[in-house]
Amino acid sequence: MEPFGARLRRAMDERGPLCVGIDPHASLLAEWGLNDDVAGLERFSRTVVEAMADRVAVLKPQSAFFERFGSRGVAVLETTVQEARAAGALVVMDAKRGDIGSTMAAYAESFLHKDAPLFSDALTVSPYLGYGSLKPAVDLARESGAGLFVLALTSNPEGGEVQHAVRGDGRSVGATMLAHLAAENAGEEPLGSFGAVVGATLGDLSSYDLGINGPLLAPGIGAQGATPADLPRVFGAALRNVVPNVSRGVLRHGPDVTALRTAADRFAVEIRTAVTAS
C-alpha cells in the first residue's frame, strides 16, 4: 500500500485538510434524539459516515466511545471504519495506545495490520513510556503503509506538566518527541507518515520546531476554543501540514445529513481562508 503520508497529502490537496471526529458520547447521542445504546451508537456513526466520508480528508473515531458498549460496540466500530474507508475517507483511529514490547506489538496489530478488522490508515499513540516503546507500532506502520500520530503537545491543560517538562539536555519532552518524528520522516516525500498531535489551543509555538516533515493533527478547534483563524499563529511555517480536527463543532448539527455537511463545509472554507491568507 502507498505510504500514509503520501495518501494523506493527496487527500488534503483534493478535499482540504479537515478532520472530523466521530465521538458518540452520551450527551451528543441525546442531542440527536438517540438512545445511549448500541442502536443509537450505530445510527450516529452511520449518519456521520454518510455525511462526511465522501467529502472530508479524514475521519477520526474515538474508540473509547465504542468500547464502552463491549463487543457489540467494537463491532459497530469495525463497520464504521470499513464503511468510511470504502467511501474514500482516511481513518485515524483515536485510541491513544501506549505500552512496551509484546503488548505494544499487540496494540499495533489490532489497528495497523492490513488484515485486522479494525485496520485504520493511522493510529494515535502515547509515547510516555519512552518514545522507543513505540517501535513495534512504527515498524508495523511502515510495513502496512499506515501512519501514527504521536501525542506531543496536546490541547488539554494538564498535558503541560509532562510535555513542557525540561529534560537534562535542556529540551522539553514535547520537543524531544517532535525531534524523534522528524528523524522518522527524514527524506520522505511528499509527506512523512509519522505525525504529531499538537493542540490548536496552545498559542504561539515558535519555540518548537514543528518542521517534522509529517502531518500535525490539531485538536481544539470549536468546543475547546480555538478557531481556524488561530492556525497560522500557532503553526507558522508548518501550516501546510496541519490537519485541523473538529468534532462537536460539526456533530452538534446532526442528525440531519445536510446540516452536518453544511457545518463541515463552513469549517473547511474558514480553514482554507486562514491557510491562503497566511
UniProtKB/Swiss-Prot annotation:
Q: Which PROSITE patterns match?
A: OMPDECASE (PS00156)
Q: In which pathway does it act?
A: Pyrimidine metabolism; UMP biosynthesis via de novo pathway; UMP from orotate: step 2/2
User: What are the catalytic residues?
Assistant: 96 (proton donor)
> Catalysed reaction(s)?
orotidine 5'-phosphate + H(+) = UMP + CO2
| A molecular function GO annotation | orotidine-5'-phosphate decarboxylase activity
**Listed InterPro entries:** Aldolase_TIM (IPR013785), OMPdecase_AS (IPR018089), OMPdecase_type-2 (IPR011995), OMPdeCOase_dom (IPR001754), RibuloseP-bd_barrel (IPR011060)
Per the UniProt entry, what are the Gene Ontology biological process annotations, in alphabetical order? Answer: 'de novo' pyrimidine nucleobase biosynthetic process; 'de novo' UMP biosynthetic process
Q: What highest taxon heads this organism's lineage?
A: Bacteria
EC id: 4.1.1.23
Give the main EC class.
lyase
> Record's Pfam families?
OMPdecase
The UniProt entry, under Gene3D superfamilies, shows:
Aldolase class I (3.20.20.70)
Give coiled-coil spans as residue ranges. Answer: none
Which keywords appear in this protein's UniProt record, sorted alphabetically?
Decarboxylase, Lyase, Pyrimidine biosynthesis
Q: What family is this?
A: Belongs to the OMP decarboxylase family. Type 2 subfamily.
HAMAP family, per the entry: OMPdecase_type2
- Name recorded for this polypeptide: Orotidine 5'-phosphate decarboxylase
The taxonomy runs:
Bacteria, Bacillati, Actinomycetota, Actinomycetes, Kitasatosporales
The gene name on file is pyrF
